[in-house]
Amino acid sequence: MPDIACQPHQDPQGKLNWVGMSGIELPIKIEQDSQTLTLSSQVQAYVSLDDPLSKGIHMSRLYLILDEMGSNAPLNPASIQTLLTAFIESHQGLSQNAFVEFRFDYYERRRSLKSDNSGWKHYPCTLRGEMRNGQFECEISISVPYSSTCPCSAALSRQLIQEAFEQQFNGQDLDYNQVLEWLGTPEGICATPHSQRSYAQVKLKVNAEHPLNLSNVINQIEDAVKTPVQSTVKREDEQEFARLNATNLMFCEDAARRLQAKLESCPEYKDYWVRVNHLESLHPHDAVAIVTKNVPGGYSDEPNFMERFQN
């Protein structure tokens, strides 16, 4: 059968940075503790077209390599490196560089704060790999929701409570039980600080030997911010959630610095990029802070916007 992709190209001639496919629907395998999950993903796959005389690449070869990997090998940095090597080998004489990206939704059961319950939580994830001039790079991206309570609003609320107390008991001699009883009334908490669902968007550069453990990445992020959103909640869980928010008041700057400190303590990450988004309940806009590891040739500090963080 004729294959015009193998015929020489005439005019105009030129090399192309990337040629390939996007929106590929592919089941993938992700290892989670002692089990292997099968998840649906959307994939981009590309190779460079380095021969200006070639009409094009062989897209079916990329697809077949992807299909074989998705059916057999769990997705991790090592398997992505193997995949990219196979992309380039399948285009000998045409391509020196390769790129792949997997976007998927990772679900995990997370325990409630106090009660003996657990529930599903959803984390949008992306795994990217690139082989350029023989050098391999791999990136893990994840979006983790948490709660943030405004320190300024908390201080203003405390002031109103103090004023209400003074107005109610001005000049009176009080005993312990009177104060305790008043604190349990609606008037005892006449103002509450505003809080909001917030998102930590994190990109991590890892080596090929890095064992992909998304649960560990989630734990590191949630341990840093201290206020992860909850799925299954009983009254004791909601009360503990309120306590955690009160003891972890955060501007977006505070959340970014907490994540910075956590990731700096993790030698397994060659580089990181963090964007925290506080979806303000007080304002119609978001409060945002961005931090990178600032390694030479590493992530840019451009405030680009990761997609799907509100999913």
Curated annotation (Swiss-Prot):
It is an enzyme of class 3 (hydrolase). The gene is folE2. It catalyses: GTP + H2O = 7,8-dihydroneopterin 3'-triphosphate + formate + H(+). InterPro entries: GTP_cyclohydrolase_FolE2 (IPR022838), GTP_cyclohydrolase_FolE2/MptA (IPR003801). Keywords: Hydrolase. The lineage of its organism: Bacteria, Pseudomonadati, Pseudomonadota, Gammaproteobacteria, Thiotrichales. It holds the Pfam family GCHY-1. One of its GO terms (biological process) is tetrahydrofolate biosynthetic process. The keyword Hydrolase applies. HAMAP family: GTP_cyclohydrol_B (MF_01527_B). One of its GO terms (molecular function) is GTP cyclohydrolase I activity. This is GTP cyclohydrolase FolE2. Its EC number is 3.5.4.16. Pathway: Cofactor biosynthesis; 7,8-dihydroneopterin triphosphate biosynthesis; 7,8-dihydroneopterin triphosphate from GTP: step 1/1. Belongs to the GTP cyclohydrolase IV family. The keyword Acyltransferase does not apply. The record marks C150 as: May be catalytically important. Converts GTP to 7,8-dihydroneopterin triphosphate.
